[in-house]
Amino acid sequence: MAAGAGARPAPRWLKALTEPLSAAQLRRLEEHRYTAAGVSLLEPPLQLYWTWLLQWIPLWMAPNSITLLGLAINMLTTLVLISYCPTVTEEAPYWTYLLCALGLFIYQSLDAIDGKQARRTNSCSPLGELFDHGCDSLSTVFMAVGASIAVRLGTHPDWLFFCSFIGMFMFYCAHWQTYVSGVLRFGKVDVTEIQIALVIVFVLSTFGGATMWDYTIPILEIKLKILPVLGVVGGAIFSCSNYFHVILHGGVGKNGSTIAGTSVLSPGLHIGIIIILAIMIYKKSATNLFEKHPCLYTLMFGCVFAKVSQKLVIAHMTKSELYLQDTVFIGPGLLFLDQYFNNFVDEYIVLWIAMVISSLDMMRYFSALCLQISRHLHLSIFKTSCHQAPEQVQVLPPKSHQNNMD
């Protein structure tokens, strides 16, 4: 080869793995403006706490570092609880519930101030918005698992399945309506209220033990654990009705389409396939896979959900179509095929294989996405820099603390 000859271009498949976004998508990303509206019930009093907390955060600490630290603490405390209660029917030591309460509260606090830190350091950017929502998608899964363990919901497998997946569905719907309308809307009862409610559940389990939720309420003749479940059902109905009111009334695109000019119903295919596969595998399992390994089962599908949610977020930010074909469905597909062939391989082994594939695929995609955007915008993911992109945040009145994208 002649000296000075250019290096051979990378294969297309390798480029697709390391650079998920096209040049056109990156150009549209530069034009993206984060727009949010709404104020929740607990926001005004908590704003005082968040403002106080922010003053203790050093200026050199990047907003994304704050977000990641909160996620890591939440995941770690939940994994400790999972290690004691893998089937969600056991009772863990009291300190594990207290640890989860502290972990979730710390996560909520850090998640609320990362955007404040971004504005404080003049480092707001589309990268921060993506990173924040990407971490939130994974945290949603761990919160559902931890809360289910705290009330020993494994004694009611169907309710456990519902509560494990409804949080994922609502998170996805929140960003689905954003993809349609271009505005991320927050209700009177939103993620902050849910997080505080879960902290209270963990505290109650700390002092009363997880078995306290098995107490039968006189007259009503229902177990105490059904009350938080009914709260989840009511909240899901209320929130989803608001989401679909926005979705079904048309988007901001041409002829009432999404922000990308696609059908307002198209994102439903992705979350629909995930939930249908989860239900089919749960109900058709000859070895009661979900009942025996609910935490692993939920975490595996949670990784699938997290990647699909991340794709929806970036599709909104780049005004792009959300494609259905994706490696994210390989893990659940293996479980489905194993059942189709009468459990040729032990389901538990296949579940672990699916977990490894799904988690690695999700992390690979999210990492590649963040690295590509950071290179394009000349940003550092975990350091503040004088080369940060200009602030692109628009808050619709009334002002909301949730509008904290960095």
UniProtKB/Swiss-Prot annotation:
Residues engaged in binding CDP-choline: N64, R119
Cellular compartments annotated: Golgi apparatus membrane
Active site, renumbered: H133 (proton acceptor)
Top enzyme category: transferase
Residue ranges annotated as Lumenal topological domain: 84-93, 151-160, 208-222, 282-293, 340-346
One Pfam family from the record: CDP-OH_P_transf
Segments on the Cytoplasmic face: 2-62, 119-125, 180-190, 249-265, 317-329, 377-406
EC numbers on record: 2.7.8.2
Pathway(s) it belongs to: Phospholipid metabolism; phosphatidylcholine biosynthesis; phosphatidylcholine from phosphocholine: step 2/2
Binding annotation for Mg(2+) 1: D111, D114, D132
GO cellular component, one term: endoplasmic reticulum membrane
Keywords recorded for this protein, A-Z: Acetylation, Golgi apparatus, Lipid biosynthesis, Lipid metabolism, Magnesium, Manganese, Membrane, Metal-binding, Phospholipid biosynthesis, Phospholipid metabolism, Transferase, Transmembrane, Transmembrane helix
GO molecular function, one term: metal ion binding
Binding site for Mg(2+) 2: D111, D132, D136
Site (Increases basicity of active site His): E129
Transmembrane segments: 63-83, 94-118, 126-150, 161-179, 191-207, 223-248, 266-281, 294-316, 330-339, 347-376
Superkingdom of origin: Eukaryota
Catalytic activity field: CDP-choline + a 1,2-diacyl-sn-glycerol = a 1,2-diacyl-sn-glycero-3-phosphocholine + CMP + H(+); 1-octadecanoyl-2-(5Z,8Z,11Z,14Z-eicosatetraenoyl)-sn-glycerol + CDP-choline = 1-octadecanoyl-2-(5Z,8Z,11Z,14Z-eicosatetraenoyl)-sn-glycero-3-phosphocholine + CMP + H(+); 1-hexadecanoyl-2-(9Z-octadecenoyl)-sn-glycerol + CDP-choline = 1-hexadecanoyl-2-(9Z-octadecenoyl)-sn-glycero-3-phosphocholine + CMP + H(+); 1-hexadecanoyl-2-(4Z,7Z,10Z,13Z,16Z,19Z-docosahexaenoyl)-sn-glycerol + CDP-choline = 1-hexadecanoyl-2-(4Z,7Z,10Z,13Z,16Z,19Z-docosahexaenoyl)-sn-glycero-3-phosphocholine + CMP + H(+)
Modified-residue entries (N-acetylalanine), positions: A2
Membrane topology: Multi-pass membrane protein
Family named by the database record: Belongs to the CDP-alcohol phosphatidyltransferase class-I family.
Stored PANTHER family: CHOLINEPHOSPHOTRANSFERASE 1 (PTHR10414:SF32), ETHANOLAMINEPHOSPHOTRANSFERASE (PTHR10414)
Function: Catalyzes the final step of de novo phosphatidylcholine (PC) synthesis, i.e. the transfer of choline phosphate from CDP-choline to the free hydroxyl of a diacylglycerol (DAG), producing a PC. It thereby plays a central role in the formation and maintenance of vesicular membranes.
Name recorded for this polypeptide: Cholinephosphotransferase 1
UniProt source species: Bos taurus (Bovine)
Gene symbol of the encoding locus: CHPT1
